[in-house]
């Protein structure tokens, strides 16, 4: 995931290869806490909800900057166990990750893990190809190749082949989207080029 520090150290090709989908977050919780989310529909409703995140993930700072309580662990494998054991209330997961993760942790949780059906978070973020600043010619070659793929439709064809099912399964059109600011997003992020990003209009 891009950040101001990462773009200082490395050379990014600013084409978000997942079209920003890692910033579209479904809310994983437990069955016994699901009802507590039923009346929530705005950011202010989450001020007493404890979000589970990785200790040094960029997402953690995004939540903190939005005034949301966060509990963390340095071990990815322990994050779902924290949720199952009630050490946090909700674990936001990318819509690209959530189905696989729920299946992976089903044996530990039984049927206890679920997704809040009417809410999701969204914040701008990008995953790029990064290269050493000592090798700009490689970055230029990749940038040129991606431009060709975008112009001839191959980029979108591959994107839809791999990710359309997850997008549809997320049922975005029937969710309230809580939008957060990403204060660590570099100024050169091409947010104005809407063709690079997924949006609800693509449903």
Identify the residue ranges that each predicted region occupies.
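Acidic, polar ligand-binding/catalytic clefts
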Residues: 1-45
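A ligand-binding cleft/hinge motif common to bilobed small-molecule-binding domains
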Residues: 1-10, 92-112
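Periplasmic-binding protein-like
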Residues: 20-26, 107-143, 165-189, 197-200
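Bilobed "Venus flytrap"/periplasmic-binding protein-like clamshell domains
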Residues: 27-67, 79, 96
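Ligand-binding clefts/hinges and TM-proximal coupling segments of bilobed small-molecule sensing domains
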Residues: 54-66, 146-203
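Hydrophobic residues within well-ordered alpha-helices
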Residues: 63, 83-84, 129, 142
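Short helix-initiation/N-cap motifs at beta->coil->alpha
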Residues: 71-85
């Amino acid at each position: 995931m891009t950040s101001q520090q990462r773009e200082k150290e490395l050379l990014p090709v600013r084409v978000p290869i997942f079209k920003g989908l890692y910033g579209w977050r479904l809310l994983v919780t437990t069955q016994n806490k699901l009802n507590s989310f039923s009346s929530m529909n705005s950011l202010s409703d989450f001020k007493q909800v404890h979000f589970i995140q990785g200790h040094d993930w960029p997402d953690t700072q995004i939540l903190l900057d939005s005034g949301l309580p966060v509990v963390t662990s340095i071990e990815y494998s322990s994050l779902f166990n924290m949720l199952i054991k009630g050490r946090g209330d909700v674990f936001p997961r990318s819509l690209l990750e959530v189905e696989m993760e729920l299946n992976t942790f089903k044996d530990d949780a039984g049927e206890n893990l679920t997704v809040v059906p009417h809410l999701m978070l969204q914040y701008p973020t990008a995953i790029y190809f990064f290269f050493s600043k000592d090798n700009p010619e490689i970055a230029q070659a990749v940038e040129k190749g991606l431009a060709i793929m975008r112009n001839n439709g191959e980029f979108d064809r591959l994107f839809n082949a791999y990710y359309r099912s997850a997008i549809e399964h997320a049922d975005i059109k029937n969710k309230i989207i809580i939008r957060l600011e990403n204060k660590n997003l570099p100024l050169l992020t091409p947010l104005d080029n809407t063709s690079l990003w997924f949006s609800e209009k693509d449903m």
